[in-house]
Amino acid sequence: MIIFKNLILKISSLRFAISLIIFIAITSGIGTFIPQGNSNKFYIDNFDSAPIFGFLDGEKVLKLQLDHIYTSIWFLFTLILLCISLSACSFRRQIPSLKASLKWIEYNNEKKFSKLQLTSSHPINQDGDHISKVDLLLKKRGWKTYKFKSHISARRGLIGKIGPLVVHIGLIVLLLGSAYGSFTSQSNEQYLLPGESLDLVNESTNSKANIKLVNFSIERESDGIPKQFISKLNFSSEDLNINEIKTAKVNHPIRFKGLTIYQADWAISNVVLEIDNILYQLQLKEIPEIGNQVWGVLVELGSETKKNFLLTIDNENGPLKISNVENFSGNNLYINDRPLEVNSSKVSLKKIIPSSGLIIKNDPSIPFIYFSFILIIFGTIISLIPTNQLWIFVNKESHKLSIGGLSNKNLVGFKKEFFKLSEEIKNF
């Protein structure tokens, strides 16, 4: 029993909870640094030759479950342990403290007043119901009072005592919601060309919806660096009687019937070429060996002797580079520019077709996450409200009225109010 009590004491301590929060923050940071959810081969190929931090190779990453941190056993155990710590702290400290603050504390002799933060006393005449007058004054000033025969207990701002408990509940909901989301959330990345669409099916309601990419554009800085990606999407559903257009941007996702659509990436998927008076739409693939965000395709050109040429592009505005695979010498093609003669073939660029990379995510934990944030913010705000307490004692033998006050926050502000009240009581 003693061992169990000591264990609860350690688990419910602030130091233990802070240690867990720091550990979760560090591991979450590692999770943003190490790609999550890829195949075992990916980690072996990428980290065996260049270990993370100099010692974490692919095998160690897999063994330590760093490839799926947020669903790993040790990470979930840490979340559960933090929930237990916060719950233990709430039951051991916050709830007893709240219960104690609900009780009216009696200060029925002058010796007790010396222990308070603020005290004052005034002589009174023998006649007059001073207790009732003070009680009425305090109620007018917004104080909750409890009147005894010879003394009064008063308090204000008790809601501030609830704040830490609300924050703890919010953190617990956040942790449980995050753990729930790591198992139940689903995401799918799709690349859509303008005019293309995809169907969404909600199995729980047996309803269907269609998302169509109306337009995709890229805003660039003056030096050509991408500034913003913008997808204009049409949402339609006969089952839900919906037909509306919404815009997705980076950091500005679209929320639709429990789904969140993020603007995540882009690509140049197709180019339209006119080769010897015939139009061809060629599909491009990313070529990381050449450079970051470079797309291309290998084509045969020539009216008599066919030769391979590599077409590459890295910008939705062009140019398209045509390179001879033998010596990689080449020329640039611009949209609607005059045709180039390549190996006796006339080639012109008619159109560049970029595609929008969208991540469609279904995360049932989002309402829990938002609710937890509301609780945490609300709890933090009301925690700032000071809890003030007053005691008034009338000693009929010495004909003296004593006033004492206590505040857990903003003692300077409470001190001004205390002595103002003291002067009003003195003038009775």
Curated annotation (Swiss-Prot):
The coiled-coil segments of this chain are: none
- Fetch the Pfam families from UniProt: ResB
- Name the source's superkingdom: Bacteria
Cite the entry's keywords alphabetically: Cytochrome c-type biogenesis, Membrane, Thylakoid, Transmembrane, Transmembrane helix
InterPro entries per record: Cyt_c_bgen_Ccs1/CcsB/ResB (IPR023494), ResB-like_domain (IPR007816)
Query: What's an example Gene Ontology biological process for this entry?
Result: cytochrome complex assembly
Tell me if Membrane is a UniProt keyword of this record.
yes
Membrane protein topology class: Multi-pass membrane protein
Where would you find the membrane-spanning parts of this chain?
14-34, 72-92, 162-182
Q: Which GO terms describe its cellular component?
A: plasma membrane-derived thylakoid membrane
From the Swiss-Prot or TrEMBL record, state where the protein is found: Cellular thylakoid membrane
Similarity section: Belongs to the Ccs1/CcsB family.
What's the subunit arrangement here?
May interact with CcsA.
Q: What does this protein do?
A: Required during biogenesis of c-type cytochromes (cytochrome c6 and cytochrome f) at the step of heme attachment.
The protein's name: Cytochrome c biogenesis protein CcsB
Q: Which organism is it from?
A: Prochlorococcus marinus (strain MIT 9312)
